[in-house]
A protein has these predicted regions:
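Acidic-glycine-rich active-site phosphate/pyrophosphate-binding loop
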Residues: 1-11, 43-56, 242-261, 293-311, ...
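Flexible, glycine/charged-enriched surface loops at secondary-structure junctions
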Residues: 44-48, 88-93, 114-117, 197-204, ...
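Signature of multi-pass transmembrane helix bundles
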Residues: 109-261, 428-436
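A structural signal for small-residue-enriched, beta-sheet-centric alpha/beta enzyme cores
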Residues: 2, 21-25, 55-56, 143-147, ...
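Conserved phosphate/anionic-ligand binding catalytic regions in large, soluble enzymes, centered on
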Residues: 20-36, 264-281, 323-326
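N-terminal signal-anchor module of multipass membrane proteins
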Residues: 6-41, 45
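Early transmembrane hairpin of solute transport permeases
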Residues: 31-131
Length: 436
């Protein structure tokens, strides 16, 4: 068993990374930054300038904004200024009303908002907002590296907060605290399977929120309605009425609603609601239909979510690699555990996932993310089925090595560094295509 001090630090890490969110986290992070700048200014700004990293732009261009029936950054920025509350974090717009949405639309139409690509930065998650009023006062708020992490706040040139970013953990010598919380797949598995149950029951909230989001989504017509399609006669006729089809339907329906801008909270993972859904719903549905115990489900959810957090530590919050690869790898581990697998089989499931999905490109948050989530989740089930029979991709195949942690590093090296040019080309295509 992992000692109490290390368990405490891992639990703190999980509670930072597994948090509720309403709407896609990138536009919500921009709304949060606008809300903070507005609160610092002390009045509704007459003009707002937003300087954003390429990955923030990419993930905010085509996704629905909760409660608005609108898509994209301008309305998210306007509502952040008019009604956003920074104390709500990624639920910054949870109190928005129809009347306030109308005010937000007017704010956008008055062309008070300017959005720019921030040049000369290395951070893939960067949001800088400058809010000004008619009297010439200004306030600046900057978020970087994490969706809710403010690194600088200014008012009229006076610095109120300044927390320069440290180098990424992989670029500097680890501190004692880093070493205490340094993860490997073995440590993730041991934590999930041996930690006293009462210490990890907080993860049940992920089940409650994401299961509710999945159910609510089936009541409406959101996005491409993939989840609904899979649950109807056509879907059942082709996919069958099985654990597999139920997993796909439950997971994709929650993603349908979220990407369409439904005001339904979900439990996110590492700054992504879709990743939180993908870490949760496949595990929950499998456990229910496989008749696993409540304890087994709780431990499987911890294993799924913590595996995703571990992979994201070296990948980064945003990258050219689709996040469903990471989250679905977590759910593959959770499902393998629920099938009765031990550490060896869980490691096999990770190798199977990397052998299949490495290189899936992220082309921004949008309704079609439900399709990618379903691809990831279906691969998770297949990977677990192979792993539980001790079948796995081997050292002779592509990115796979005998050491599973090195396999994970191979995946994240590609996503964090190797696909940077791909990322630039994707954004170029997205910003120059003709939309009619």
């Amino acid at each position: 068993m992992i000692n109490q001090k290390k368990r405490k630090r891992i639990i703190e890490l999980m509670k930072r990374e597994v948090v509720p969110a309403i709407g896609c986290t990138e536009p919500m992070a921009v709304s949060l930054c606008v809300a903070k700048a507005t609160e610092t200014l002390g009045c509704t700004p007459t003009h707002i300038e937003a300087y954003l990293s390429a990955n923030i732009l990419k993930n905010a261009m085509g996704v629905g904004i909760p409660g608005t029936r609108m898509v994209g950054l301008p309305i998210a920025i306007a509502l952040g200024a008019l009604v956003g509350k920074s104390e709500y974090g990624l639920e910054v717009l949870r109190d928005v009303t129809d009347a306030e949405v109308a005010q937000g639309k007017q704010y956008v139409e008055e062309q008070r908002i300017s959005i720019h690509l921030k040049d000369g930065i290395d951070e893939k998650l960067y949001i800088e907002v400058i809010a000004t009023d008619d009297a010439g006062h200004s306030a600046t708020a900057i978020i970087a590296r994490d969706h809710t992490h403010f690194i600088r706040i200014e008012k009229d040139g006076e610095v109120l907060l300044n927390q320069p970013l440290k180098k990424h953990q992989t670029e500097e010598a680890p501190t004692k605290d880093d070493e205490e919380c340094e993860l490997t797949l073995r440590r993730v598995f041991d934590f999930a399977t041996t930690t006293p149950l009462e210490e990890i029951e907080f993860i049940k909230e992920a089940r409650r929120l994401n299961e509710n989001a999945s159910r609510e989504a089936l009541k409406g017509n959101y996005g491409h309605s993939l989840g609904k399609t899979l649950s109807r006669p056509l879907g059942k006729g082709i996919m069958g009425d099985s654990i597999f089809s139920h997993i796909l339907s439950a997971t994709s329906s929650a993603c349908d609603a979220r990407m369409a801008g439904a005001s339904i909270p979900v439990m996110s993972n590492s700054g992504s609601g879709n990743q939180g859904i993908s870490c949760t719903m496949p595990v929950v549905v499998f456990a229910e239909e496989n008749h696993n115990t409540d304890e087994e489900l709780t431990r499987a959810l911890i294993l799924s979510h913590l595996t995703a957090i571990y992979i994201k530590q070296s990948l980064g919050k945003l990258s050219a690699l689709c996040g469903c690869v990471v989250a679905s790898t977590g759910s593959a581990c959770g499902i393998t555990y629920l099938m009765g697998g031990g550490y060896k089989q869980v490691a096999y499931s990770v190798k199977n996932m990397i052998a299949n999905l490495a290189g899936m490109v992220c082309d921004g948050a949008k309704p079609a993310c439900a399709l990618k989530v379903t691809s990831g989740v279906s691969t998770a089930v297949l990977s677990a089925m192979l792993a539980i029979q001790n079948r796995h991709a081997t050292n002779a195949e592509g990115l796979i090595e005998d050491d599973v942690d090195r396999c994970i590093r191979n995946l994240t090296r590609i996503g964090a560094s190797g696909m940077n040019e791909t990322d630039r080309m994707v954004l170029d295509i997205m910003t120059h295509k003709s939309c009619k």
